Amino acid sequence: MKISYDKEIDALSITFKETTVTTKHIAEGIAVDYDSDGVVSGIEILDVKKRLGGNDTFKQVVLEGVGLELAA
């Protein structure tokens, strides 16, 4: 999974897998990408700071149960 933020256009992108997609706009500024089997492969949210409550809220990112493995 890849999470990226483009501060120039204030867009958050979450990619679950890299593949050829069909994009469906589900609401103003929110798009969901589907793979050929209809499984969600990504999500894009525009105007993310406004949607999440501004800079202070957006800066607080919590990863739960991600299962990160650290190299020894």
What is the role of each PLM region?
Residues 1-72:
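Small, basic N-terminal interaction modules of short regulatory proteins
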